[in-house]
């Protein structure tokens, strides 16, 4: 079995392999999207294929939406040319459930794939056509937090950004510069409203995206490269909005055991592609079942009915509360605790750590006893139930190939937010004693031990 539209016609072979297929007419979806594009997504990585693309497929399967997603890649063009187009923009989502079952689904919600390459006339002109369309409602992003950075460590604009400021929208070459250029094109073609939605896993992601795009709008309007009204357009949320969001779903690099399982079932498109930029991409993506996407409901031109696929739309304040709940109490501190001690104790799978009674006690006390008394309760999600799911279903899942080594990356930058907020809440409380905290300080001590560069058995970390 191959990921090709022509192969999907032989439904019996897919059913025999227990692989679900799209339940809608892909050709009709593509034609409708061509005429009336609604959703463009920047960033063609695993999280996109496993989450937003799957959400839209659910809406298409149920007849709630008629258009698909147009995916655009601005960092590594080879992903589009080597992984998307040769497979008719199809991918296989493998959901690894904690109860031992595996759900396999062909994702066919992508209408087309494009490179954000100004020097590729066909793709660039198609993007301009899409951005000029009044029907376009949202542009979403999974380009990592670094993707929004336009400054050097000293705070000065990077050289490529300054070059774009001088070159103007017609000649912009940086990632955000090309996005800003497309927004300017939309402005010149009638200034229809639009939502630019970062769904990257970072706090206040909408503000990060706004700051980057706004810098270009200011520079271009000040130096005469763009009309004065463009800055007003970008800074008017009734015209262009930058909603905040919180996303939570783990999509590890394609796993060898999943690859073998698919091959045994007769699925032959399993080989990973490594691009010249060292991006790993496979025709399939493996992911955990649990997923959360909370988005500020600020869409000046409408939006897909994603609430019917489980997305929660709410206020900016609530998005921030959900983010704080996850990052400061219910998920990230527990992950960091397991990552640090997992590396020290020689574990290579997070799930195996949950077989160690001492490590289970560590994260249970950090979460339930030390964290919950000062947790931020967002109202739309229960903090206790969230921790229950993390510790009873998500982390113990033996089918999730996640590692303490991956999670331990950049821990020095994470400790302050993941534990410091809880410590500050204790210090500010008249009812709680910060000296009562025992296991959160243990994580700090464990990190100091980790920095020695060797596990407890002396093996280099």
Whereabouts are the PLM-identified features?
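Substrate/ligand-engaging "lid" and interaction regions
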Residues: 1-42, 46-461
């Amino acid at each position: 079995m191959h990921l090709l539209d022509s192969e999907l016609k032989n439904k019996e072979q897919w059913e025999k392999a227990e692989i679900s297929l799209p339940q809608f007419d892909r050709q009709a979806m593509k034609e409708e999207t061509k005429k009336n594009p609604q959703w463009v997504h920047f960033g063609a990585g695993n999280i996109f294929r496993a989450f937003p693309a799957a959400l839209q497929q659910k809406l298409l399967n149920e007849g709630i939406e008629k258009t698909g997603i147009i995916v655009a890649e601005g960092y590594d063009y080879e992903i589009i040319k080597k992984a998307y187009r040769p497979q008719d923009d199809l991918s296989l989502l493998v959901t690894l459930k904690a109860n031992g079952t595996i759900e396999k689904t062909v994702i066919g919600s992508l209408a087309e794939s494009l490179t954000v390459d100004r020097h590729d006339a066909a793709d660039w002109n198609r993007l301009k056509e899409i951005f000029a369309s009044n029907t376009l409602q949202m542009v979403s992003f999974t380009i990592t937090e670094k993707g929004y950075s336009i400054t050097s460590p000293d705070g000065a604009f990077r050289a490529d950004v300054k070059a774009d400021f001088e070159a103007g929208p017609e000649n912009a070459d940086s990632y955000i510069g090309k996005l800003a250029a497309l927004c300017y094109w939309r402005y010149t073609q009638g200034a229809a409203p639009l939502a630019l939605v970062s769904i990257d896993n970072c706090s206040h992601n909408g503000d990060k995206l706004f700051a980057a795009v706004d810098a270009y709008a200011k520079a271009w309007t000040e130096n005469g490269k763009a009309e004065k009204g463009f800055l007003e357009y970008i800074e008017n949320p009734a015209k262009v909005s930058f909603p905040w969001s919180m996303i939570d779903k783990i999509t590890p690099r394609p796993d060898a055991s999943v690859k073998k399982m698919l091959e045994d079932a007769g699925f032959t498109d399993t080989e990973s592609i490594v691009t010249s930029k060292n991006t790993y991409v496979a025709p399939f993506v493996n992911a955990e079942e649990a997923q959360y996407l909370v988005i500020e409901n600020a869409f000046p031109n409408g939006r897909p009915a994603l609430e019917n696929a489980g997305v929660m739309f709410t206020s900016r304040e609530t998005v921030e509360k959900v983010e704080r709940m996850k990052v400061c109490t219910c998920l990230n501190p527990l992950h960091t605790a397991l990552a640090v001690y997992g590396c020290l104790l020689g574990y290579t799978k997070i799930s195996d750590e949950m077989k160690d009674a001492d490590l289970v006690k560590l994260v249970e006390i950090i979460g339930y006893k030390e964290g919950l008394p000062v947790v931020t309760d967002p109202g739309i999600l229960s903090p206790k139930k969230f921790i229950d799911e993390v510790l009873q279903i998500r982390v113990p899942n033996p089918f999730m190939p996640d590692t303490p080594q991956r999670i331990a990356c950049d821990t020095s930058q994470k400790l302050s937010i993941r534990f410091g907020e809880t410590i500050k809440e204790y210090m500010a409380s008249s009812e709680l004693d910060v000296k009562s905290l025992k296991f959160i300080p243990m994580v700090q001590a464990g990190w100091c031990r980790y920095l020695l560069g060797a596990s407890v058995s002396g093996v280099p970390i």
